[in-house]
Curated annotation (Swiss-Prot):
Residues 305-349, 437-483 are annotated as: Disordered. Residues 324-342 have a biased composition (Polar residues). Residues 454-478 have a biased composition (Low complexity). It comes from Drosophila melanogaster. PANTHER family: DDB1- AND CUL4-ASSOCIATED FACTOR 10 (PTHR14588:SF2). Keywords: Phosphoprotein, Repeat, WD repeat. This is DDB1- and CUL4-associated factor 10 homolog.
Length: 621
């Protein structure tokens, strides 16, 4: 440290190695020096419930906490003292906070509303925004378009013009809908919108224009497009949106990110942050087995265009898989409308049910869905039916109805229950025998009455997220109703068994293959399953803070705490993703840590836990 300061005082050039070693010493020496409970009366400690989120203002001198029991806490970041406490900021849990400037901020809640606040007068809200039909889980602000952006578990993304008030309220618009939406983030430069979902994929919208987003992506359903990719079954209503992935899409171009570490079959991607310099994105996901959580860093930038393609002025063709299909002559399916997930009644049980079998449906030429065993003539008319991955949408709706009916029997409250999920497709499907695929019964049990086995009941009571998608396949010789026994989970996979893999004779179609984006990863503990843990970047982007049990871990990209890799180093990491390097591990809380946030101005870290404690950390040099 003395050598570094001496060189800087003398005006000598600071070597990168010296800078890295200094940053490593600063971050690895982080220690707790104050806590919210230490400044409370003993009777007040923990009354606010869990701390779900923390947010600094742009100057870094104010911290706002969102709590489980409807409360908003405002702290002075310099003295760590509580400035304001709003006990009934909402009528339900407060989930998220977003500052517009030094004094104005918004909060989102499980009461389906967004509230606007001014630090100069915390006695009342500036305005309450109504529009969502489910829990509001994320708020962003686009300084470029001057629009507030909110998203919730209803799958909807709304924009609000907070500068144009009318008698009916603020001017708002629903610009996009994605089933299973968990989080959305706008990059600091305002040119990208990133969505993470419960479907095991991340969606990046490049060259973001919120004013035309609704028109540019009207009708596009990323969940159905992902089903087509996983099942390798051509779906006309999904494939007709190939143009949104094209380089010719000058505004609101879409890219899907689906690669994850080995042994991490990502399902519920529940937290999302973007690097301060817009280099990458940080996510935290729950694997499909619900036994592990993972922190991952993916590249957020567009894939480079080859120089020969630029010179020839020819659009580069993305990598695609060739699939054969007979749908070219039978693509007259009715376009489905976007449907919100079923609304939830607050404070009721939210534990999902599990399903252990799937009936594969098929569509005839008129688009009417039915089970393959409903009509005996199916076996002799194999060419008049098409594989129906659209049955996944029916499954989603049926599952939501079942969950709605089952809420009374379970009192568990989870941060991401009632969000349907499919897995990312990283791990192979477990081996299934032909007998289990075909089933011994010709009339399978309906989806609404799963078998009440002990394993299903135990899994249903110990897990907090479930998947609800299905794929269908048919044989070249006959169409048979297939019950896919996949344990306690509905999973979508591409099957290679001759029993289920269809073969077609007509022209083939290509399906886009997503680019590899994974850079770094780390395995996490799965303590307090059902609660969302929010990681975060440091202000300089060198360090990642990730909740880990009753504490946090600080990760770096390398042992020497170097900055984000560039040029050749970046290409090496991208070709072979690496584990994040643990710089420090701090355990100071009495309960599981749910959120962590760095100050935008100094090496100051704040964490919040399930017990309601807010803890402050700084370097101890």
């Amino acid at each position: 440290m003395e050598r570094y300061l001496s060189r800087r005082e003398s005006g000598f050039h600071i070597h990168r190695s010296d800078d890295n070693s200094l940053m490593r010493r600063i971050y690895s020496s982080m220690n707790m020096f104050n806590s919210y409970h230490a400044n409370c009366w003993p009777t007040d400690a923990g009354r606010t419930g869990a701390i779900f989120n923390l947010e600094f203002n742009a100057d870094g001198n104010v911290v706002v906490a969102a709590t489980e029991r409807k409360c908003v806490l405002v702290f002075d970041a310099i003295t760590q003292k509580e400035i304001f406490k709003v006990p009934d900021a909402h009528t339900d849990s407060v989930n998220c906070i977003k500052f517009f400037d030094e004094r104005l901020f918004a909060t989102g809640s499980d009461d389906f509303t967004v509230a606007l606040w001014d630090l100069r007068n915390m006695k009342q809200k500036l305005r309450v925004l109504h529009g969502h039909s489910n829990w509001v889980k994320n708020i962003e602000y686009s300084s470029k378009d001057k629009l507030l952006v909110s998203s919730g578990f209803d799958g909807s993304i709304f924009t609000w013009d907070i500068n144009s008030q009318t008698e009916q309220g603020l001017i708002s618009q629903r610009v996009f809908h994605a089933s299973g939406l968990m989080r959305c983030r706008i990059s600091p430069t305002g040119d990208k919108l990133v969505l993470c979902t419960s479907g095991g994929y991340i969606m990046i919208i490049h060259h973001l224009d919120l004013t035309t987003l609704h028109k540019d992506l009207c009708g596009f359903r990323p969940g159905i497009y992902r089903l087509m990719q996983l099942g390798e079954q051509y779906i006309p209503q999904a494939a007709k949106y190939d143009h949104v992935f094209s380089k010719r899409q000058k505004k609101n171009r879409v890219e899907l990110v689906t690669d994850f570490p080995e042994n991490n079959d990502a399902e519920m991607i529940m937290a999302l942050q973007i690097h301060p310099h817009c280099c990458c994105m940080l996510t935290r996901n729950v694997s499909c087995d619900e036994q592990s959580e993972w922190t991952c860093i993916h590249d957020i930038n567009e894939e480079p265009v080859r120089s020969e393609d630029e010179q020839d002025e020819v659009e580069p063709q993305p990598k695609r898989k060739r699939v054969s299909t007979t749908l070219a002559s039978r693509s007259s399916l009715n376009e489905s409308q976007d449907q919100d997930t079923v609304g939830l009644t607050p404070r009721q049980a939210r534990r999902p049910l599990r399903v252990s079998s799937v009936q594969v449906f098929q569509l005839d030429n008129s688009g009417a869905g039915r089970g393959a065993s409903d009509n005996p003539s199916v076996l002799t008319r194999s060419d008049s039916f098409i594989p129906d991955i659209w049955a996944a949408e029916v499954t989603v709706q049926e599952r939501a109805i079942r969950q709605n009916r089952a809420r009374v029997s379970n009192n568990h409250v989870s941060g991401y229950n009632f969000v349907y999920a499919i897995s990312s497709g990283v791990l192979p499907l477990r081996q299934l025998g032909a007998n289990s695929l075909m089933g011994s019964s010709t009339s399978p049990r309906p989806l609404t009455t799963p078998p009440p086995t002990e394993s299903n009941q135990s899994s249903s009571s110990s897990s907090s997220s479930s998947s609800s998608s299905s794929s269908s396949s048919s044989s070249n010789n006959s169409d048979t109703t297939v019950r896919l026994e996949i344990g306690n989970r509905l999973r979508l996979r591409s099957f290679n068994s001759p029993v289920t893999t269809p073969t077609f004779k007509e022209n083939g179609h290509s399906i886009l293959v997503n680019a590899k984006k994974l850079l770094y990863y780390a395995a996490e503990t799965n303590t307090k399953p059902g609660f969302i843990k929010e990681p975060g970047f440091s202000a300089d982007g060198r360090v990642v803070c990730s909740p880990y049990g009753n504490g946090v871990r600080l990760f770096g990209y390398s042992e020497d705490c170097c900055d984000y890799p560039k040029c050749q180093a970046f290409e090496e990491v991208k070709s072979k993703p690496r584990k994040l390097v643990e710089l420090a591990k701090i355990t100071e809380h009495q309960d599981v840590v749910l959120c962590a946030k760095f100050s935008p101005r100094e090496p100051l870290l704040v964490t919040g836990c399930n017990g309601g404690e807010v803890t402050w950390y700084r370097p101890n040099l």
